[in-house]
Amino acid sequence: MKTLYSLRRSYPVETLFNGTLALGGRDQATTGFAWWSGNARLINLSGKLLGAHVAHAGLIVFWAGAMNLFEVAHFVPEKPMYEQGLILLPHLATLGWGVGPGGEVVDTFPYFVSGVLHLISSAVLGFGGVYHALIGPETLEESFPFFGYVWKDKNKMTTILGIHLILLGAGAFLLVFKALYFGGLYDTWAPGGGDVRKITNITLNPGVIFGYLLKSPFGGEGWIVSVDNLEDIVGGHVWLGSICILGGIWHILTKPFAWARRAFVWSGEAYLSYSLAAISVMGFIACCFVWFNNTAYPSEFYGPTGPEASQAQAFTFLVRDQRLGANVGSAQGPTGLGKYLMRSPTGEIIFGGETMRFWDLRAPWLEPLRGPNGLDLGKLKKDIQPWQERRSAEYMTHAPLGSLNSVGGVATEINAVNYVSPRSWLSTSHFVLGFFFFVGHLWHAGRARAAAAGFEKGIDRDTEPVLFMNPLN
């Protein structure tokens, strides 16, 4: 009779395994690092370090999924997102999921699906992390040489860099595909107060895209944060994705040049410091982007920017007083300047009063009222639409810097509606994270350079308090 199963079924699996679940070889005597140094104990154990990284990714994705579902469960469709303390649903809405004209949420099911998908993938990552941390081979070099590495192997390190760059480029292209083929993105500038649309006429002109990088970061110039249309944003992602993928292929196929081998420190801690520096810069840029930019971060979801709330207040009172008979073109304020309208330093007609310092604000609810010389007096008298009045009144009372009367004020004053703008939250958190990542960069870069020079910087191992504490086990 034919045997339907392998006669070797009881033989041990031939992959290299760590036969015990005990975490041997992870103590200070073996690694030179105490338990609280975390992954430093795994510097030369590529299999275990893989487990730590995969488990860490699982925790991140788990937070995203759980917080996503938490926000869906608490979401009230009748209130704007920015009034509900949401920080994840605004991102999904900006990508065009579940929203219609004016940023109104018409379907929360895509948000639910997003949360569930993240939870499921976090379980897969969590399993992989536990497997590699406890059961899988301690090192990958012998059994899986493609995934193994030695920190000082410069060619292998640039190959790993190349793989990372290709994955980042693919991520950039995901946004491009969403904008072009999969329903489009939410465009706050769409006529009538914003809508979801496919971005078909993307900007590929390198002069425009790279021109942003050459702009001044100050004032109305605003560096890359000044981008005010989705065509440029999606085009920028095409360029960025292409550069990352081509750069990744380059780093996989080539070996580092002699000047690069001499210039860099080639150790695990050095690579950590480079990564921390990069993510610190990203944190600071994200801080500025979410605070000032109302195209990539539409005010319908994140609340108004500071300048936007201030200009909305001036606009709201102009509308009110004009209805009461005021001549907004000629009325003077207490200083003799225009009470409602005045001239900017470059001659345009702008809102008067304290909000004059925000004269170069651009916002979708205000731009239709401008002419070639700034605000158009004729349009202000005849063309103001109800949706513009409603939106400015709403934004006026939801400034990211709250104040006593719920209008734009300074950060030290209480806000009457117990309101924290997602812009305040996201920009502050990214600034703080960017700062601490920068401090981490300085710390690890200093240690890496010291180690490369043959001495150690940091806490004195002979006197550190943890040596006098009981071991965890």
From Swiss-Prot:
GO cellular component, one term: photosystem II
Top-level taxon of the source organism: Eukaryota
GO BP field: photosynthetic electron transport in photosystem II
Membrane topology label: Multi-pass membrane protein
Cofactor note: Binds multiple chlorophylls and provides some of the ligands for the Ca-4Mn-5O cluster of the oxygen-evolving complex. It may also provide a ligand for a Cl- that is required for oxygen evolution. PSII binds additional chlorophylls, carotenoids and specific lipids.
Residues noted as binding [CaMn4O5] cluster in the record, renumbered to the chain: 367
Alphabetical list of SUPFAM superfamilies matching this protein: Photosystem II antenna protein-like
Keyword tags: Acetylation, Chlorophyll, Chloroplast, Chromophore, Manganese, Membrane, Metal-binding, Phosphoprotein, Photosynthesis, Photosystem II, Plastid, Thylakoid, Transmembrane, Transmembrane helix
UniProt GO molecular function: chlorophyll binding; electron transporter, transferring electrons within the cyclic electron transport pathway of photosynthesis activity; metal ion binding
Compartment list: Plastid, Chloroplast thylakoid membrane
Transmembrane segments: 69-93, 134-155, 178-200, 255-275, 291-312, 447-471
UniProt keyword Ion transport present: no
Keyword Cell cycle: no
Residue span(s) of the pro-peptide: 1-14
Family stated for the protein in its record: Belongs to the PsbB/PsbC family. PsbC subfamily.
Subunit structure: PSII is composed of 1 copy each of membrane proteins PsbA, PsbB, PsbC, PsbD, PsbE, PsbF, PsbH, PsbI, PsbJ, PsbK, PsbL, PsbM, PsbT, PsbX, PsbY, PsbZ, Psb30/Ycf12, at least 3 peripheral proteins of the oxygen-evolving complex and a large number of cofactors. It forms dimeric complexes.
Protein task: One of the components of the core complex of photosystem II (PSII). It binds chlorophyll and helps catalyze the primary light-induced photochemical processes of PSII. PSII is a light-driven water:plastoquinone oxidoreductase, using light energy to abstract electrons from H(2)O, generating O(2) and a proton gradient subsequently used for ATP formation.
Protein name: Photosystem II CP43 reaction center protein
Species lineage: Eukaryota, Viridiplantae, Streptophyta, Zygnematophyceae, Zygnematophycidae
Gene from which the chain derives: psbC
